[in-house]
Amino acid sequence: MKLATTSRTTAVALVALAALAACSSVEITSTTAAPVQTATTVQATTVPSVTVAATAVPTTSPTTTPATTAPATGPAPTAPPATTPPTTVPPEEPVRVLVTNDDGYSAEGIDMVVQSLLAFDRPVFEVTVVAPLTQQSGQGGNFTDGPVNATSVTTLSGYPATAVEGFPADAVRWALDQGGIDFIPDFVISGTNEGQNLGPFVDVSGTVGAARAAAVRNIPAIAISTGFASFDYEATIDVLRDYLAGNLDTLLAHEAGTPVATVISINVPSCSAGEVRGLVDVPLGTDLQGFDYGADVDCTNPAESPADDVQAFFTGFAAVSPTPLEPAPVG
């Protein structure tokens, strides 16, 4: 019995030793677990890289990119129609011009004036032609008592016109007083005449007479004449265009129905040499001062500062002169 007890005691001791050994292995295992914790720490250090990736997400966010590119490529059909600006400019009111002369409706000069007005881009001229049926040079401001007859015709180039049986002033009177036209012209152009109408001769000029007939009816008027000899109408038309370009606003600023102070008389030389030297504002002359009225003009003449329309014309300038509405008193 005693031996058995000893054996049992020995067995218990062995079990205790085994348990102790087991505890020791657990501690060793626990000691070797430290590297595992280190590995876990290494994994934890990779988290910031994930965080960096997460930070980059806003720069590539799909909600940001469309918002940036939409204004550049997006069409505007969604805008309300009411806010769409107009794509057309309202048409410009035409400038209404009555054209007349004293050489008759079939003369080259009046047709050249008509064609030059129609060639303007801006403003748009609405041209109406009413002129004597026949040549009426030298008739001044003469007019017929009572109504006059008129006939539909065409100018040299085929433009519609009305031919009046009477004086140059009758043509204007028929248009404005007899109801020949149904509007009030913005201004009247008389000419261009075949031959100059300088100061000493304005009162016998039918070209000036027709312009005066318009002016006394409170309508601005221009009388334009081309110098004798070669009748350089092209040069005259250039002068007329230049004059209108610089003075159209003044002509159109005239208030309908208010008095007109003067007629503008323009005389353009036909140059035998050189070219017209430009437009110059001068008063009417009272005599020819020795100039040959029917001679060609040397437009290379160097003289400057002409005193009147006679000097200006014969030294190569286009003379622009305000002309009284009434003829100068005789005697």
Where are these regions (language model features)?
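Bacterial N-terminal signal peptides that target proteins for export
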Residues: 1-12
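C-terminal motif of bacterial Sec signal peptides marking the signal peptidase cleavage site
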Residues: 18-22
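Bacterial signal peptide processing site
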Residues: 24-27
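Extracellular mucin-like PTS domains
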Residues: 29-91
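A cross-family phosphate/adenosyl-ligand binding-site feature
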Residues: 93, 115-171, 176
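Active-site-proximal beta-strand/loop segments in catalytic clefts of secreted hydrolases
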Residues: 100-103, 130-135, 164-167, 190-194, ...
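Charged helix-capping and loop-helix junction motifs
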Residues: 203-209
